[in-house]
């Protein structure tokens, strides 16, 4: 490709509304341009990267035995009504009517469509298992699109769906897809973790997220320092170790009129925060027990996903309001605690090991100090309620936990029969009777993968693609002052034709631009290998080579240039 025949839309300045690095660099590199909130045009440089990412995904999916299909973006509402998600899905589901007043949606996902397709096309257990995938546009009407294509309203996804007669068959495909995803992200050159995850609105049982580690990520990824354990913070088990110490002081009632938060209590009374507990009041699952107290250590955070799995707690978790709390307990938030509490309480594992701790007295403006379980208050039910923190023991007993930010780029689920039962997707079983199919689903955010690669791999000059396979161009030819030097132009043209004939994805910068501008643009878009042709060096029989990833520069004899490039690229 010649730059003179290419839409090369780089920007010198960073747009003010771009907050994260990937958004900034994708705009500056001329990969995307905004059209409306959360909607983007993909320019030639962006499309080249996108198609290369898709190529890797297709190759690995095909190796894993998946078969490609293509399903409509526009989906009839009756399929969503049949699955039960028409009412469950929130406003991010874009609904509309056609000219015949029929209801449709713009698909945020395709479980309903694929289930409908398979129940029409597959009739016997002999046709299973099947694993079908597509790479298709999705639309979710995000309330606050942000971070460029990282969280846009329209995006491209690879979504796959597998169908089985048994849970064992699903597990086999799930394991294959886990490895396929690992292969994809390894080929992309990404530093990622496969983590245990919550199934969320998709539903189902087992689930893993594939998280690219990056400071701009929106998820907290927890992993062990010494083992393969990794989990989303929502799912990571908090292990409490040690034994509860014996009491050392008598419980006392203390006036605390100005201590309405844990931090105020700690500051005003010079207490160690790890010797305090906080009591959170949530709605109960049983109308006979409308409020439930959740008690965690003062420096810990409640894990709402874990808490709402307790049978006494309403799912989804909902906090009680001030009026409800005051009416039932007789005290306001900030003065609540375990002693003389008149509603069911659940305490975190760490709290169960505490002694001589401080908590609200359930009397406004008062706290109890030096509280001890069994002596001063009966031990409530113990449950894992908190988020893990760095330094906690790994749940598998190997090493301690680290926490980093992550960008979710892939997610695999064992759906089970959630959709197939609702939509009556059955086949004839071996015994001749109808058998409800068991399902799995497997998604990759293709456009998000591009952004996450940039988040993880860049410098102050621009993008550094982690793999040559996804760079928009593999080699850049930069002839200095070509339009003033016949020898430079002749050699550059010959090299360009040679590389093209050998299948190298090469960009030839034949613009009438200053060398500094040409260098800056090629570094900005992240071309991994740059060949710089100058008249003086050419007269000496040498060509300059620059490696974008390592920063390495070297002079190469022009007679050996192709063989050296062959070695560096590994594909000539």
UniProtKB/Swiss-Prot annotation:
UniProt-listed InterPro entries: aa-tRNA-synt_IIb (IPR002314), aa-tRNA-synth_II (IPR006195), aa-tRNA-synth_II/BPL/LPL (IPR045864), Anticodon-bd (IPR004154), Anticodon-bd_dom_sf (IPR036621), Pro-tRNA-ligase_IIa (IPR002316), Pro-tRNA-synth_IIa_bac-type (IPR004500), Pro-tRNA-Synthase_IIa_type1 (IPR023717)
EC numbers for this chain: 6.1.1.15
GO biological process: prolyl-tRNA aminoacylation
Domain of life: Bacteria
GO cellular component, one term: cytosol
Keywords: Aminoacyl-tRNA synthetase, ATP-binding, Cytoplasm, Ligase, Nucleotide-binding, Protein biosynthesis
Entries under SUPFAM superfamilies matching the protein: Class II aaRS ABD-related, Class II aaRS and biotin synthetases, YbaK/ProRS associated domain
Compartments it resides in: Cytoplasm
The reaction(s) this protein catalyses: tRNA(Pro) + L-proline + ATP = L-prolyl-tRNA(Pro) + AMP + diphosphate
Aminoacyl-tRNA synthetase keyword on record: yes
Pfam families documented for this protein: HGTP_anticodon, tRNA-synt_2b, tRNA_edit
Record-linked CDD domains: ProRS-INS (cd04334), ProRS_anticodon_short (cd00861), ProRS_core_prok (cd00779)
GO MF terms, alphabetically ordered: aminoacyl-tRNA deacylase activity; ATP binding; proline-tRNA ligase activity
Subunit structure: Homodimer.
Domain notes per entry: Consists of three domains: the N-terminal catalytic domain, the editing domain and the C-terminal anticodon-binding domain.
Function: Catalyzes the attachment of proline to tRNA(Pro) in a two-step reaction: proline is first activated by ATP to form Pro-AMP and then transferred to the acceptor end of tRNA(Pro). As ProRS can inadvertently accommodate and process non-cognate amino acids such as alanine and cysteine, to avoid such errors it has two additional distinct editing activities against alanine. One activity is designated as 'pretransfer' editing and involves the tRNA(Pro)-independent hydrolysis of activated Ala-AMP.
PANTHER family for the chain: MITOCHONDRIAL RIBOSOME PROTEIN L39/PROLYL-TRNA LIGASE FAMILY MEMBER (PTHR42753), PROLINE--TRNA LIGASE (PTHR42753:SF2)
Entry similarity comment: Belongs to the class-II aminoacyl-tRNA synthetase family. ProS type 1 subfamily.
Name listed for the protein in its UniProt record: Proline--tRNA ligase
Organism encoding this protein: Haemophilus influenzae (strain PittEE)
Gene transcribed to yield this protein: proS
């Amino acid at each position: 490709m010649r730059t003179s025949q290419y839409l090369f839309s780089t920007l010198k300045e960073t747009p003010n509304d771009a907050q994260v690095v990937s958004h900034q660099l994708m705009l500056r590199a001329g990969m995307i341009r905004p059209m409306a909130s959360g909607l983007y045009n993909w320019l030639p440089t962006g499309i080249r990267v996108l198609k290369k990412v898709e190529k890797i995904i297709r190759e690995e999916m095909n190796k894993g035995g998946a078969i490609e299909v293509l399903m409509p973006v526009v989906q009839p509402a009756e399929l969503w009504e049949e699955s039960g998600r028409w009412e469950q899905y929130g406003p991010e589901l874009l609904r509309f009517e056609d000219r015949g007043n029929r209801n449709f949606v713009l698909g945020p996902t395709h479980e309903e469509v694929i289930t409908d397709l398979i129940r029409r096309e597959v009739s016997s257990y002999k046709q299973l298992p099947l694993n079908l995938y597509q790479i298709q546009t999705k639309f979710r009407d995000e309330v606050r699109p942000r971070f460029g294509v990282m969280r846009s309203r329209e995006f491209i996804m690879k979504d796959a769906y597998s169908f089985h007669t048994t849970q064992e068959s699903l597990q086999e495909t799930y394991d294959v897809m886990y490895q396929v995803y690992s292969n994809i992200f390894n080929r992309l050159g990404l530093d990622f973790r496969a983590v245990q995850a919550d199934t969320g609105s998709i539903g189902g049982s087992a689930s893993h997220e594939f998280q690219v580690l990056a400071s701009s990520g929106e998820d907290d990824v927890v992993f062990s320092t010494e083992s393969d354990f990794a989990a989303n913070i929502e799912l990571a088990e908090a292990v409490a170790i040690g034994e509860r110490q014996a009491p050392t002081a008598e419980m006392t009632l203390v006036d605390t009129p100005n201590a309405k938060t844990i931090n105020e209590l700690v500051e005003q009374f010079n207490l160690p925060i790890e010797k305090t507990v906080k009591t959170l009041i949530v709605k109960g699952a049983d109308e006979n027990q409308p409020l439930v107290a959740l008690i965690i250590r003062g420096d810990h955070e409640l894990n709402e996903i874990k808490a709402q799995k307790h049978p006494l707690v309403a799912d989804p978790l909902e906090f009680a309001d001030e009026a409800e709390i005051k009416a039932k307990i007789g005290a306001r938030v900030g003065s609540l605690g375990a002693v003389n509490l008149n509603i069911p309480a659940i305490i975190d594992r760490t709290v169960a090991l505490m002694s001589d701790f401080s908590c609200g007295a359930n009397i406004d403006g008062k706290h109890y100090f030096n509280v001890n379980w069994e002596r001063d208050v009966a031990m409530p039910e113990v449950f894992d309620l908190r988020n893990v923190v760095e330094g906690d023991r790994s749940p598998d007993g190997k090493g301690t936990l680290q926490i980093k930010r992550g960008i979710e780029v892939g997610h695999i689920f064992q759906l089970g029969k959630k959709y197939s039962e609702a939509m009556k997707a059955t086949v004839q079983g071996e015994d001749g009777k109808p058998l409800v199919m068991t399902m799995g689903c497997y998604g990759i955010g293709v456009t998000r993968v591009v952004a996450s690669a940039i988040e993880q791999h860049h410098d102050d000059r621009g993008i550094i693609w982690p793999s040559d396979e996804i760079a928009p161009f593999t080699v850049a030819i930069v002839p200095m002052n070509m339009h003033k030097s016949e020898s430079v132009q002749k050699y550059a043209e010959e090299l360009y034709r040679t590389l093209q004939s050998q299948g190298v994805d090469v960009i030839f910068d034949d613009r009438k631009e200053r060398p500094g501008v040409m260098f800056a643009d090629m570094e900005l878009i992240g071309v991994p290998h740059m060949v710089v042709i100058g008249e003086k060096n050419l007269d000496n029989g040498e060509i300059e080579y620059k490696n974008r990833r390592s920063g390495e520069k070297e002079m190469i004899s022009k007679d050996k240039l192709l063989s050296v490039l062959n070695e560096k690229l590994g594909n000539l």
